[in-house]
């Protein structure tokens, strides 16, 4: 079904352009009506990251929810996974996170969570979309039933304690010098405090949000600053979160980046050794490196692949009973503990492995050599180039040449008229050659 407001991760857009206070007001009213079930007093928790527009959207949502009779609990700046956890913990009917994740400050978004802490299904989002466009004036609460709003104290400590409880009680990071980059985002308070409480020597960066600097040259999408800082202070490890802290990238003591694939390899091995894997495998997307798949196979584990997007990873985990999954970009989902990707929780699991091994991060977190990848795009104006006979022939020939030595992934973008062609394999020149052949065939058809 076509979507008007919701994308793959909630309602998102440029602040005060596509995502206005009026739209946020209507989202609050519509979502409140959709979850106002039964006779009990209904409540919604709202968290946000540190974007300037978060104040505007937060207040508009409060007006929307209270106008239809829902009480609002305001958390302030908190990681996305913390909002999911607190939605469950506070027995709320609904949770909301105001964030555009790793995007620049001028974007923002509204993510919704059900009472179980999971993001909403497509069906419920469709119901909310229909309500957004309705005349809701006749569904407003009576004056005596208008909701109340209040700020909740102590939520940072609750999330930190929750994060610490994912580790053994005697686990300590004493002796580890850790640089943590919070992207001037939602975790700027909780991440350094959690690491300090676990005994680490903590050096913080990206912890001075001003409403405009979220994700600006810091965080998981810009790890160069963290790499430089780790080398400068001779730290054992660096941790980079994104703006809403649902993804993480790690940097070893040499300043080398450890991506989500390597993090999943570390966690999968650790969980297997401890008997914590719910199945003999993990879930990742089609973009994860073939090197990860081969590593897991050598460990006696499988890799189940999904479409790109952490929501698809989580859907597969829930339907098939996996408890570890993620994306190369650093979304790591540990479903024994969290209902969404949680950068801090994933980092704690990796640090626990490092602390127990007493080996440098460069050894612990380099589980496999990634295969060379080549990614190229072709823009087209109309039609369906992938269905053309010449393109199909080029794809078949490319797959035949790669055979068991690599793989080819071709997918249209979900947001623009672009076809992405990704190849990977043992031989870089072969991979680049087959990708170029498919690209050339697509360009001729697209022209």
Swiss-Prot record:
This is Phosphoglucosamine mutase. The active site is at 101 (phosphoserine intermediate). Keywords: Isomerase, Magnesium, Metal-binding, Phosphoprotein. Activated by phosphorylation. Mg(2+) binds at residues 101, 242, 244, 246. Its cofactor is Mg(2+). InterPro entries: A-D-PHexomutase_a/b/a-I, A-D-PHexomutase_a/b/a-I/II/III, A-D-PHexomutase_a/b/a-II, A-D-PHexomutase_a/b/a-III, A-D-PHexomutase_C, A-D-PHexomutase_C_sf, A-D-PHexomutase_CS, Alpha-D-phosphohexomutase_SF. The modification Phosphoserine is found at residue 101. Catalyzes the conversion of glucosamine-6-phosphate to glucosamine-1-phosphate. The gene is glmM. Binds 1 Mg(2+) ion per subunit. It catalyses: alpha-D-glucosamine 1-phosphate = D-glucosamine 6-phosphate. It holds the Pfam family PGM_PMM_I. One of its GO terms (biological process) is peptidoglycan biosynthetic process. GO terms for molecular function: magnesium ion binding; phosphoglucosamine mutase activity; phosphomannomutase activity. Belongs to the phosphohexose mutase family. HAMAP family: GlmM_B (MF_01554_B). The lineage of its organism: Bacteria, Pseudomonadati, Pseudomonadota, Alphaproteobacteria, Hyphomicrobiales. It comes from Azorhizobium caulinodans (strain ATCC 43989 / DSM 5975 / JCM 20966 / LMG 6465 / NBRC 14845 / NCIMB 13405 / ORS 571). Its EC number is 5.4.2.10. One of its GO terms (cellular component) is cytosol.
């Amino acid at each position: 079904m076509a979507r008007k407001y919701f994308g793959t991760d909630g309602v998102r857009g440029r602040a005060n352009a596509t995502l206005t206070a009026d739209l946020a007001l209507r989202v609050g009213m519509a979502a409140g009506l959709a979850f106002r079930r039964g006779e009990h007093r209904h409540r919604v928790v709202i968290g946000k990251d540190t974007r300037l527009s978060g104040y505007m959207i937060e207040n508009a949502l409060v007006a929307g929810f209270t106008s239809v009779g829902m009480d609002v609990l305001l958390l302030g700046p908190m990681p996305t996974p913390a909002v999911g956890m607190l939605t469950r913990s506070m027995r709320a009917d609904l949770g909301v996170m105001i964030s555009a994740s790793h995007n620049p400050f001028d974007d923002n978004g509204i993510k919704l969570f059900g009472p179980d802490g999971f993001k909403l299904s497509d069906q419920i989002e469709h119901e909310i979309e229909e309500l957004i466009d309705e005349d809701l004036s006749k569904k407003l609460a009576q004056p005596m039933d208008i909701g109340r709003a209040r700020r909740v104290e102590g939520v940072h400590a609750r999330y930190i304690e929750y994060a610490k409880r994912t580790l053994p009680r005697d686990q300590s990071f004493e002796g580890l010098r850790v640089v943590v980059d919070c992207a001037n985002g939602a975790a700027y308070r909780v991440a350094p405090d959690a690491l300090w409480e676990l005994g680490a020597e903590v050096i913080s960066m990206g912890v001075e949000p001003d409403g405009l600097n979220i994700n600006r040259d810091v965080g998981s999408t810009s790890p160069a600053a963290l790499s430089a800082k780790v080398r400068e202070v001779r730290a054992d490890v660096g941790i980079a979160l994104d703006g809403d802290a649902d993804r993480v990238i790690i940097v070893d003591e040499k300043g080398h980046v450890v991506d989500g694939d390597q993090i999943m390899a570390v966690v999968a091995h650790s969980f297997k050794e401890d008997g914590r894997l719910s199945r003999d495998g993990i879930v990742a997307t089609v973009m994860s490196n073939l090197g990860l798949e081969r590593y897991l196979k050598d460990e006696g584990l499988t890799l189940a692949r999904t479409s790109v997007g952490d929501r698809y990873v989580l859907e597969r985990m829930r339907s098939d009973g996996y408890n570890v999954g993620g994306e190369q970009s650093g979304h790591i989902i540990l479903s024994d503990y969290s209902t969404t990707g949680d950068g801090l929780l994933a980092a704690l699991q990796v640090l626990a492995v490092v602390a127990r091994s007493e080996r440098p991060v460069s050894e612990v977190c380099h589980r496999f050599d990634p295969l060379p990848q080549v990614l190229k795009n072709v823009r087209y104006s109309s039609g369906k180039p992938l269905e053309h006979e010449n393109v199909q022939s080029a794809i078949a020939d490319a797959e035949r040449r790669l055979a068991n030595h690599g793989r080819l992934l071709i997918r249209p973008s979900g947001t623009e008229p672009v076809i992405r062609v990704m190849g990977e394999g043992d031989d870089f020149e072969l991979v680049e050659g087959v990708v170029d052949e498919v690209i050339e065939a697509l360009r001729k058809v697209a022209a």
